[in-house]
Amino acid sequence: MTDNRYDNLGQLGTSTPLPDNPDTAALERVANPCDAPYMTRFVCPEFTSLCPVTGAPDFAHLVIDYVPRDWIVESKSLKLYLGSFRNHGAFHEACTTGIGQRLVKELDPVWLRIGGYWYPRGGIPIDVFFATGEPPKGVWIPDQDVPGYRGRG
């Protein structure tokens, strides 16, 4: 027996190639199955993109937190969307805030934040943060707890 609420999903349960770039990557959503407010966290410790100037690889640890309203993101589509940045040239700030803005556009969450903890290039780590506003009251919002980059120090 199949649940027709999920007929709109085109990636889950199928062999889906990695999209060429984030602009063409499909983010899929499903109806929020919960009535109570809650927070969902996605962690991508091996996010990659390319420097738009040199083409050198950039690496980040992403933490995405959101409080859903009517929709939740389907996790395989999120994984493929994030993977589509692998050969995409953009600065750290554009990647991090662009991911947050795309999720807001697709999901219309109560609240969302993303932390992009970028590994050093040229000796300088860059951390980029985006949020839609203050966290809602009555929902447990844990710290992202990603330590600052220390290298050998």
Curated annotation (Swiss-Prot):
Keywords associated with the record: Cytoplasm, NADP, Oxidoreductase, Queuosine biosynthesis
Residue segments, region Disordered: 1-22
Role played: Catalyzes the NADPH-dependent reduction of 7-cyano-7-deazaguanine (preQ0) to 7-aminomethyl-7-deazaguanine (preQ1).
Record: active site: 51, 58
UniProt catalytic activity: 7-aminomethyl-7-carbaguanine + 2 NADP(+) = 7-cyano-7-deazaguanine + 2 NADPH + 3 H(+)
EC class (word): oxidoreductase
Major location (coarse): cytoplasm
One Pfam family per UniProt: QueF
GO terms for biological process, alphabetical: queuosine biosynthetic process; tRNA modification
Family statement: Belongs to the GTP cyclohydrolase I family. QueF type 1 subfamily.
Gene label: queF
GO terms assigned for molecular function: preQ1 synthase activity
Lineage top rank: taxon: Bacteria
InterPro entries on file: GTP-CH-I_C/QueF, NADPH_dep_7-cyano-7-deazaG_red, QueF, QueF_type1
Metabolic or biological pathway: tRNA modification; tRNA-queuosine biosynthesis
Provenance organism: Maricaulis maris (strain MCS10) (Caulobacter maris)
Gene Ontology cellular-component annotations: cytoplasm
SUPFAM superfamilies linked: Tetrahydrobiopterin biosynthesis enzymes-like (SSF55620)
Protein's name in the database: NADPH-dependent 7-cyano-7-deazaguanine reductase
EC number: 1.7.1.13
Record-listed substrate binding positions: 73-75, 92-93
Localization: Cytoplasm
